[in-house]
Amino acid sequence: MPLVISADEIKKKLPNYSPEKAEFFHRESARLADKNFEKALKENPFKEVILLCGGTASGKTEFLVTQLNRKHCIILDATLSTEEGAGIKLKKILKAKKKPIIYAVIPDDLKRAFIAFLNRDRKFSDAHFYMTHAGSRRTLLWVT
């Protein structure tokens, strides 16, 4: 079983959190996810670290649950929407002498992903959807 770190799961445990206000809790949950990620890199014996990359509602979590649930590794369930953030995470993984692996999850139909995004319990602005999809693709090109 992998050790999964997800800002979305952390968000649910924050005081006064409600899905309608998800965007307001995102910065804090992402900060806590980064902190948990750093701790896992230091303390967890797994040698592989998977970074998920893809925009909001792209299917990353579903991919994780169906395809990665038997892996023995650390998994960061995030959008990887900035090159700076990706670079920092990759440097930390390498410094911990672990192997970084990036799985990019890109929806076959952006319109369908947007409809899924609009119908989620967790509410974010439309700009967040476009920012994470464009940013994750830019990051993927930067990494490769």
Q: Language-model features: where?
A:
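Glycine-rich phosphate-binding loop of ATP-dependent small-molecule kinases
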Residues: 1-144
